[in-house]
Amino acid sequence: TEWLPNILTDHHEMGTNSSFFFQPGVPERKNPLISDLNQALTREIGTYHEKALNSIGSLYYSEEDYDDFFFGKASTYPDANGSIGILFEQGSSRGHIQESVNGILTFPFTIRNQLTAAFSTLEAAKNMRVKLLNYMKDFYDDQIELNPKSSDNIVFGKLKDESTVHHLADILNSHKIKFNKISEAVSYTHLRAHETHND
């Protein structure tokens, strides 16, 4: 079976003197491939975090410090795949208890904030179920429309390191990108500079 979550959360710690962060991140530092609707849904989910964190008296912030740009991050990768990725960053107690500019910070307090945000995410997912399902459906429908079948072909390979090709094939397979092994030698007449690596 395939796992396609509607929301994926990524829980981390940050510097002790910080409070609690949740996405969306800095608006100007969003990957241009992430839709405005994705950010609007992330912001709407954020209202659930606000309410929950207010109810326990915890400080928090959003739309500062952290980006939503690099797709290699656990909180951004879902955004490129029809899901909503959310990063949580909790000021770290660096053990059981530590002083901070906001007062004494304890390990149980940091756990409580992360758990509260996890529960508020579940509440948002339940209440926004139809929106999130429609968002994912529309995301995949749009990808099909934006990427019609093309007759263009890309040839890739690496003569000195076949394992690189096998690893790339694994990645392509995991994303359901179809490819075939060529059956005969290929010669090129028009190559761009980045395509002429001989190794």
Describe every region a protein language model picked out.
Residues 1-187:
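Metallocarboxypeptidase
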Residues 154, 196-199:
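Intrinsic disorder/low-complexity detector
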Residues 189-197:
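Conserved small/polar residues in nucleotide/adenosyl-binding loops
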